Amino acid sequence: MVKINVGGCSSFVKDSEYKEYLEKAFAAYDVLESESGAGNDFLGWKHLPSQTPESLVKACEDVRDDWKNRNVDLVVVIGIGGSYLGAKCAIEALSHSFAREMRQSGAPEVVFAGNNLSEEYVSELIDLMTVRNVACVVISKSGTTTEPAVAFRIVKQHLEETYGQKEAAARIVAVTDAHKGALKTLSTQEGYRTFVVPDNVGGRFSVLTPVGLLPIVLAGFDIRALLEGAKEEEMALAEKSEKNAAVEYAAMRNLLHSVYGKSVEVLVSFTPKFQYLGEWWKQLYGESEGKDKKGIYPASVVYTTDLHSLGQFVQDGARIMYETVVTVENSNRSVVIGSDPQNLDQLNYLAGQHVEHCNAMAQLGTKLAHIDGGVPQMEVSIERINEKTLGALFYFFEFACGVSAYILGVNPFNQPGVEAYKKNMFALLEKPGFEEQTKAIKARLSE
């Protein structure tokens, strides 16, 4: 279960204010639980942990087993935004930090494509595919989103040229709409196996659907434990009490923002395994809250690394932020610092200590320094990093996001702003149907 500690904010806010925002948070909680708020047709994520059928989990595992029998050692997962960040986060968090160099896991390497339009990246992906035994998961509800569609066209061509059309079809799985769209049509024509992106689950809330479950199980991890951890968190957050961690988090972040003008939230971790937790979290909160000229800007750092760069700004820069630290209470590994007879580095005072003890003291020292410097700090903690705790963490942040956005007064489940750049890009690429926009944008650029 995820725990929260808001004590690092207590010297910055009044108790009466926090109680007021707890009341606002409980009102928003009621809206979310009653499914009566804006965007209530996109609440399918709420019960995924408790309602995901065994048949779906087994189907994901069947793909894993089939590709293992085909000796697949590279899976290219194609998707953008919520179609890849959750899976990327889980795989990075659960993998050996040097898995690529060691190649001892027994599971295929999972790489991601379709999340950018870099020609160098795509070209280097082709280089990798030419020397590996490849399969592909393509994730797109429509099949026409530019970045993943471009990547899939290229990967599909490689698979068909390398293995032939029939074998290529066995090496492609599509995660897409149940009934419509270009990718669904192509999958039916070519005979690809398909999984469904539920209509009532938005992309950034989709990590516990096949969008996340399939890549995670292909990477060799236990999606049953992931769902079990999320289910326990679902049950915990269903209890309406002042110890509801999601309510506490949503209340404090909105209090700091609305009353004290803290416009930036920095998600902090003290392990590089959580770098992509920050990326997933930024999309979740940025797209859910950043609209109607409102929102808290989500940023992320990995300490102690970033203490030697952004730490200066956090300590002494503009007082526009607060921190939310994701704490891992116990390490999965054990390394003890040894003694050195010469002690030239003057570290013998640490001899016999675990490296994680040094990390914990760095975390505590940073907390005290940043609070002294005027930066409020919340702490979200899990017992250790594994599939179960990661599932709980995913669900916690998703649920809290819904509550927080309703406090803010915005629809957590739409993202109207992401279409603006696409319209300009289509006009500049002279996509059919955009002739008038092309003419207008060319005139604008010639001024």
Listing of model-derived features with the role each one plays in the protein:
Residues 77, 136-138, 174, 267, ...:
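Structural beta-sheet core signal
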Residues 83-86, 119-121, 144-147, 180-184, ...:
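Flexible loop/turn segments at secondary-structure boundaries
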Residues 299-385:
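Helicase-primase coupling helices
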Residues 366-429:
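C-terminal helical cap and adjacent loop that interface with cofactors, partners, or active-site loops
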Residues 1-69, 339-345, 349, 437-447:
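Extended, charge-enriched "interface" segments that sit outside catalytic cores
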Residues 65, 69-240, 427:
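Glycine-rich phosphate-binding loops that contact phosphosugars or nucleotide phosphates
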Residues 161-324, 415-447:
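Active-site phosphate/pyrophosphate-binding segments
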Residues 59-73, 125-134, 252-263, 314-319:
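Glycine-rich phosphate/diphosphate-binding loops that line cofactor/substrate pockets in enzymes
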